[in-house]
Swiss-Prot record:
One GO process term, biological-process aspect: GPI anchor biosynthetic process
Protein name, per record: GPI ethanolamine phosphate transferase 2, catalytic subunit
Originating organism: Homo sapiens (Human)
InterPro entries for this protein: Alkaline_phosphatase_core_sf, Phosphodiest/P_Trfase, PIG-G_N, PIGG/GPI7, PIGG/GPI7_C
Residues bearing carbohydrate: 194
EC number from the UniProt entry: 2.-.-.-
């Protein structure tokens, strides 16, 4: 069976997406879960260690507090309370910590540090995984056991005001609630006022047991202007006033209740130096946790060095405080200072309940639980506890009793710590079988792509895929039988659950058939290669073709990037690798231009994709012999040398272009500091987004939009030009409406809205331009001779994507878009055309620049840099599919725009029937190499110290990038099929 190179590459990438999906499902482990049902009272709590018939405490201890108020301030990092900002802007909170009856901690959140997983950790005590980052966009109902579920089952009345994520996680759990949206980050005032306005009314009432307040304003300020914004201090002062009001009210009501009240101040996650969150930096994982109650002994607190605890400890502590069962999936331990004022017997009882719950969870998730040090400590603690009870029943007051009780306490606390660590470590249990299946599929695809290079890059760009030979069929059925046998053996002997084993036989069989077919094709292609004995050449069609310095740079650069993925520091700072590669590429292009225009060509030019310019377009093809045609001024003239064609100013522009591109890249590096090592350092982006420089940002945004229009409109139809101009004007109006930039005639306007109308105004023009481009492409299939119509159609699709990117980019990132278009223009006019690069080289250059611009946007391999606000531009409610697509495009706009420009360039500047196929194949290959290498690396490094903080987020990025590549290859193939239809 014969397939075009592009179609073949697209099929390979689609299969590779399936393989990486299976690998990701196996790599990100299932969380630790209890098999017991989460119903209140489904089973009685474990009795206290028996010391005779007189000790039979089988009921839950009574609650320690009458009412509990939880004030959760989104993105409240620890130094906002315990640092200089807290002393300055939160004086009442500081007073409570230093002199009041309170216990202060730094609660460490595990990555991913985004809101929904952190709420789950606080209320269930379990450790959410990275898959919760995706679910965070649309939080579904939480089915796990939690403090909220237990409180509702116990008949407690819960009132909630704040982030609507809680309402989605706990539907029908609140007797009263008012949810606020968290996606309009430009709103940091009204979103908190909507919470505070309920306080006076609800505090006067006494018909509730738990009050939860979730304030979003601080998080929104961080997303807008970072942690050093002057707005941070104002918001902290506002929160301090709220805390004082609540605390004063609770104190005044304690005379009416037999038990004291508890006020909890905490954050869900912190805030990075760029104002975002999601990763594992100290600023993102450390949050304050302050427990305030008159039940606590008044003693000075250390505001500078509070004790560090785990965020998962909050669930167990709240459950004990409210007299509820500890959530069954909790891996946290009781914060002992909360109960240290209680009698010794109650303290031991609380600790025993916690260790019993953790030991049960350990038994259900660890086959060899009896050998676990924590379980052994637990059993020893129980025995000592029994001895203490026996002594307690004999004599209630003695020094021996106190000393033994203190020993039991220490033993329980050690057991709690060890059990919690053991259970947390279970999160790192991997589904090796699923990982191996995914790895094998990806390896087979990469091997097939590498073996197909000689055929795929020939002039016809076609491959012979042997599927019907008798040898193929015999090998295929043999491999199917072997894989089926392995699957049965693994799935019937696996001790732990396996995702791939849980699939239906139809789905698992389909994957095995696919893997078998790929292996058979690889064997057939490898046999042909070995029999043919061909050695790799740049041009498989011509034996004398040679490798240029640029080709060697591409090979060495790709290999160097792949090798760098094995080091955590290089993964964190991957942007440096791409900056180095594009800078080196510019220097290599500069050398090539100087050699061509000053030294001249010493011999015939290298063979490859050569451009011939005519007044209706240009042609290019892989040549069968030396002497490629060069750039022509007129179709009817001869083929003068490059130095004869390009003279005067145009020649100097060719020579200067690499250096201009270098200058642009240097400016863009200063715009957004990314990575880890230098992310905290000031950059132009921070300077522009500060409230003191809104005028400068407005001017820069307007100039960038003007440059975008000038560079894009040249290839558009008149209708699309008008739509583009109005759309870019709408982009500025949208940013002005939400308060990011200013209108010249309203410099001091404080009328800030969500910009819904303005954004939808732009969407209309985006869809209109894309529709016009698609219409022209379809028309070009009917009118085969109208080559210009297809060129205009492709450019209009590209223009629509540029307009969409302009809408989604933050104002300070609009220069990134403008410089991207400028560099594409310079490369097209002064480098790719005159220097006669082939399709493979042009494709790799587009890929490299696309990757560099991914990081120029401020992205990194850190989840915290994903701008989720892009997914909600123009939306007044959450709509899942548009939100996900817009967020993905906003994040990967750089690679997508460079890939779409590549399609237009190869379709319009060349008429080679193989150019698009070659480009699609090269694009798939250069993306597949790092994907396979990285999944092998993360498999071997799965127990590395930084596997969750560094390597796992990068793995998610690689998976998403592969999905984007698959979409790009589909577009390549569609355009290539258009060419085949016309021919």
């Amino acid at each position: 069976m014969r397939l075009g190179s592009g179609t073949f590459a697209t099929c390979c990438v689609a299969i590779e997406v399936l393989g990486i999906a299976v690998f990701l499902r196996g790599f990100f482990p299932a969380p630790v879960r209890s098999s017991a049902r989460a119903e209140h009272g489904a089973e009685p709590p474990a009795p206290e260690p028996s010391a005779g018939a007189s000790s039979n405490w089988t009921t839950l201890p009574p609650p320690l507090f009458s009412k509990v108020v939880i004030v959760l301030i989104d993105a409240l990092r620890d130094d906002f309370v315990f640092g200089s900002k807290g002393v300055k802007f939160m004086p009442y909170t500081t007073y409570l910590v230093e002199k009041g009856a309170s216990h202060s901690f730094v609660a460490e959140a595990k990555p991913p540090t985004v809101t929904m997983p952190r709420i789950k950790a606080l209320m269930t005590g379990s450790l959410p995984g990275f898959v919760d980052v995706i679910r965070n966009l649309n939080s579904p109902a939480l089915l796990e056991d939690s403090v909220i579920r237990q409180a509702k089952a116990a008949g407690k009345r819960i009132v909630f005001y704040g982030d609507e994520t809680w309402v989605k996680l706990f539907p029908k759990h609140f007797v009263e609630y008012d949810g606020t949206t968290s996606f309009f980050v430009s709103d940091y005032t009204e979103v908190d006022n909507n919470v505070t306005r309920h306080l006076d009314k609800v505090l006067k009432r006494g018909d509730w047991d738990i009050l939860i307040l979730h304030y979003l304003g601080l998080d929104h300020i961080g997303h807008i202007s970072g942690p050093n914004s002057p707005l941070i201090g104002q918001k902290l002062s506002e929160m301090d006033s709220v805390l004082m009001k609540i605390h004063t009210s609770l104190q005044s009501k304690e005379r009416e209740t037999p038990l004291p009240n508890l006020l909890v101040l905490c954050g869900d996650h912190g805030m990075s130096e760029t104002g975002s969150h999601g990763a594992s930096s100290t600023e993102e994982v450390n949050t304050p946790l302050i427990l305030i109650s008159s039940a606590f002994e008044r003693k000075p607190g250390d505001i500078r060095h509070p004790k560090h605890v785990q965020q998962t400890d909050v669930a167990a502590t709240l459950a004990i405080a409210l007299g509820l069962p500890i959530p069954k999936d909790s891996v946290g331990s009781l914060l002992f200072p909360v109960v240290e004022g209680r009698p010794m017997r109650e303290q031991l009882r609380f600790l025993h309940l916690n260790t019993v719950q953790l030991s049960k969870l350990l038994q259900e998730n660890v086959p060899s639980y009896e050998k676990d040090p924590g379980f052994e400590q637990f059993k020893m603690s129980e025995r000592l506890h029994g001895n203490w009870i026996r002594l307690y029943l004999e004599e209630k007051h003695s020094e021996v009793l106190f000393n033994l009780g203190s020993k039991v306490l220490r033993q329980y606390l050690d057991a709690l710590k060890t059990l919690s660590l053991s259970l947390s470590a279970q999160v790192a249990q991997y589904d090796i079988y699923s990982m191996m299946v995914g790895t094998v599929v990806v390896l087979e695809v990469l091997t097939l792509l590498l073996l197909s290079v000689p055929q795929a890059l020939r002039r016809k760009a076609e491959l012979e895929v042997p599927l019907s030979s008798p040898g193929f069929s015999l090998l295929f059925y043999l491999v199917i039988l072997v894989l089926s046998a392995v699957h049965v053996i693994v799935c019937t002997s696996a001790e732990s659950s396996c995702y791939f084993c849980g699939l239906s036989w139809l789905a698992a069989g389909g994957v095995m058939v696919l893997a078998s077919a790929l292996l058979c094709v690889i064997v057939s292609v490898l046999t042909n290669v070995l029999v043919g004995g061909n050695t790799p050449r740049k041009n498989p069609m011509h034996p004398s073709s040679r490798w240029s310095e640029l080709d060697l740079l591409i090979l060495l650069g790709t290999a160097g990037h792949v090798l760098s993925l094995g080091a955590s520091s290089f993964v964190e700072e991957e942007h440096q690798t791409w900056y180095f590669l594009v800078n080196t590429l510019c220097l290599a292009l500069s050398q090539e231009t100087y050699r061509n225009y000053f030294l001249g060509d010493d011999g015939e030019p290298p063979c490859g994709l050569c451009v011939e310019q005519g007044h209706d377009g240009a042609t290019a093809a892989w040549q069968d012999g030396p002497g490629c045609d060069v750039l022509e001024r007129d179709k009817g003239h001869g083929s003068p040398s490059t130095s004869e064609v390009l003279r005067g100013r145009e020649k100097w522009m060719v020579l200067a272009s690499p250096w201009l591109i270098l200058a642009c890249c240097r400016l863009l590096r200063s715009l957004n500091q990314t990575g880890v090592q230098w992310a905290h350092r000031p950059d132009l982006g921070h300077w522009l987004t500060s409230s003191d420089h809104k005028a400068e940002l407005s001017v820069l945004a307007a100039l960038s939009l003007l440059v975008v229009f000038v560079l894009v409109q040249r290839g558009c139809s008149p209708v699309s030009k008008a739509a583009l101009a109005l759309g870019l004007l709408g982009v500025y109006c949208y940013r002005a409406a939400i308060g990011s930039v200013r209108f010249p005639w309203r410099p001091d306007s404080k009328d800030i809205s969500k910009g819904i109308i303005e954004a939808r105004f732009v969407y209309v023009f985006v869809l209109g331009i894309l529709f016009t481009g698609t219409k022209d492409l379809l028309k070009s299939q009917v009118i085969a001779a109208d080559f210009k119509l297809k060129t205009v159609g492709l450019w209009e699709i590209y223009s629509g994507l540029v307009l969409l990117a302009a809408l989604l980019f933050r104002p300070h990132n609009l220069p990134v878009l403008a410089f991207s278009l400028l560099i594409q223009t310079l490369m097209t006019k002064f480098i790719w055309k005159p220097l006669r690069h082939d399709a493979a080289e042009i494709t790799v250059m587009h890929y490299w620049f696309g990757q560099a611009f991914f990081y120029f946007q401020g992205n990194s391999n850190n989840i915290a840099t994903v701008d989720i606000s892009a997914g909600f531009v123009g939306l007044d409610t959450y709509v899942e599919i548009p939100a996900v697509l817009l967020t993905a495009f906003g994040t990967y706009a750089g690679p997508v725009l460079w890939a779409s420009h590549l399609v237009h360039f190869l379709s319009s500047e060349t008429r080679s029937g193989s150019a698009l196929s070659h480009a699609c194949f090269c694009y798939a290959l250069i993306c597949s190499i790092p994907v396979f290498t990285y999944i092998v690396l993360v498999t071997s490094l799965r127990y590395h110290l930084f596997i969750w903080s560094v390597f796992s987020p990068k793995l998610l990025y690689e998976g998403m990038h592969l999905l984007i590549t698959a979409a790009v290859c589909v577009f390549f193939t569609a355009m290539d099929q258009t060419r085949l239809t016309q021919s």
